[in-house]
Regions:
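Anionic N-terminal interaction surfaces
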Residues: 28, 37-92, 96-100
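Acidic, Ser/Thr- and proline-rich intrinsically disordered linker/docking segments
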Residues: 114-267, 274, 279, 283-284
Length: 284
């Protein structure tokens, strides 16, 4: 069979479109049959049509299971993580499966961990193209270079450039809230000159132990580097982490999220919290 010959769907026998088909270890699924799979499932290129049939049978059986699912705990924006503690089960209240009214009911033992992963804005405004982002530049419009401007030192000492929420502000918040082990801040948090990038959004990354679902991710709305919005979304993500840790018997962070440097009322400090971190001083 040639490379561009028509491929047939292993499930329904119809033609599998070149651009919309799903590859299996042996054969393909057409776009219509592909939509029957769970939106969180993955690894199909290493699976067979027998795996597809088993998965679809499980998806159909899940309808009855979900009909008896009664959540008594939830966390996150729009209650994205919902738990039925009596049955020891949970669902993700977002994504295709949720929208279609048949979210997979997972056992609590299938959830291995959850991490908060910030996404950073890789494009920082620099009107004079001197390597110093405008929010840190005391002399916009000059040709002063980032090296001469001691960019790394400024990046270390500031968390809020012109009232924005960036990587340094996030690190301060993470430390004060006791969430260090639950937040992954990658190397893309700073630009090539060492300046902290603004936080664009947050991702919740759930690691799963399930035959068909290895990882589930939820993406927040854009926080656009705004302290109030960023802190609110971070708190909501932290609530998900806290609930998961309680369910799994892990230590739960007790610190609050109030940050005096942000000029916001913040969240209520919990008893026995980590000491509050000092604010960042703006240059004169």
């Amino acid at each position: 069979m040639g490379l561009f010959d028509a491929k047939m769907c292993e499930l329904c026998g119809e033609k599998a479109g070149m651009l919309t088909k799903l590859k299996l270890s042996e054969g393909f699924l057409c776009s219509k049959c592909k939509k029957k799979l769970s939106g969180f499932s993955s690894g199909w290129s290493a699976r067979t049509i027998s795996d597809v049939n088993a998965h679809l049978q499980a998806r159909e059986a899940n309808r009855a299971i979900y009909s008896s699912f009664v959540p008594d705990m939830s966390a996150g924006p729009d209650q994205l993580f919902r738990v039925d503690s009596r049955q020891g089960a949970f669902v993700f209240a977002f994504g295709k499966d949720w929208t279609e009214g048949n979210p997979t009911v997972f056992g609590l033992n299938s959830l291995m961990s959850v991490k908060i992963v910030p996404a950073f804005d890789v494009f920082q405004e620099d009107a004079d193209d001197d390597g110093v982002p405008d929010r840190f530049d005391r002399t916009p419009g000059t040709a002063q270079t980032a090296q001469g401007f001691a960019g790394s030192a400024i990046a270390q000492s500031m968390g809020l450039g012109q009232g924005s929420f960036d990587a340094v502000a996030l690190q301060n918040l993470v430390m004060s809230s006791g969430m260090t082990g639950a937040v992954e801040i990658g190397t893309d948090s700073r630009d090539m000159h060492g300046f902290p990038r603004e936080v664009r959004s947050f991702v919740l990354k759930f690691t799963m132990n399930d035959p068909y679902v290895q990882q589930v991710t939820w993406n927040s709305m854009s926080v656009d580097g705004k302290p109030t919005v960023a802190m609110q979304v971070f708190q909501q993500c932290a609530e998900v982490v806290g609930l998961v840790q309680r369910l799994k018997g892990m230590p739960t962070p007790q610190a609050g999220y109030a940050q005096p440097a942000f000029g916001q009322p913040g969240f209520v400090q919990q008893p026995n919290a980590f000491p509050q971190q000092p604010g960042f001083t703006q240059p004169g």
